[in-house]
Amino acid sequence: MTKLFDSRLADVIRKPVITEKATNALDLNQYTFEVDHRAAKPEIKAAIEALFSVKVIGVNTMNPPRRTRRVGKFSGKRSQVKKAIVRLAEGDKIQLFPES
């Protein structure tokens, strides 16, 4: 991979999504991340494999609708988010929570 491509991979993944549904999916070896809305599935797969040194089996993405936000009489929209559910190979793990 080129150096420019490697620096782009770090910008693809924004943050992990920590919800009840996403936490329950950890038992199925599926991890949920908020990603750049322009990222494609191969980019997301390459970014996860490069950043966490794991083998990705599949990537599912979703673009939920933008939510409207009002401040007084002014109406606007929240920024576009894209979620990716990444399924890892058997035996691979990503450490999201610190060990106690």
Swiss-Prot record:
Belongs to the universal ribosomal protein uL23 family. SUPFAM superfamilies: Ribosomal proteins S24e, L23 and L15e (SSF54189). PROSITE patterns: RIBOSOMAL_L23. The gene is rplW. GO terms for molecular function: rRNA binding; structural constituent of ribosome. It comes from the Bacteria. It holds the Pfam family Ribosomal_L23. GO terms for cellular component: ribonucleoprotein complex; ribosome. Gene3D superfamilies: 3.30.70.330. GO terms for biological process: translation. PANTHER family: 60S RIBOSOMAL PROTEIN L23A. This is Large ribosomal subunit protein uL23. Keywords: Ribonucleoprotein, Ribosomal protein, RNA-binding, rRNA-binding. One of the early assembly proteins it binds 23S rRNA. One of the proteins that surrounds the polypeptide exit tunnel on the outside of the ribosome. Forms the main docking site for trigger factor binding to the ribosome. It comes from Prochlorococcus marinus (strain MIT 9215). NCBIfam families: PRK05738.1-3, PRK05738.2-4, PRK05738.3-1, PRK05738.3-2, PRK05738.3-4. Part of the 50S ribosomal subunit. Contacts protein L29, and trigger factor when it is bound to the ribosome.
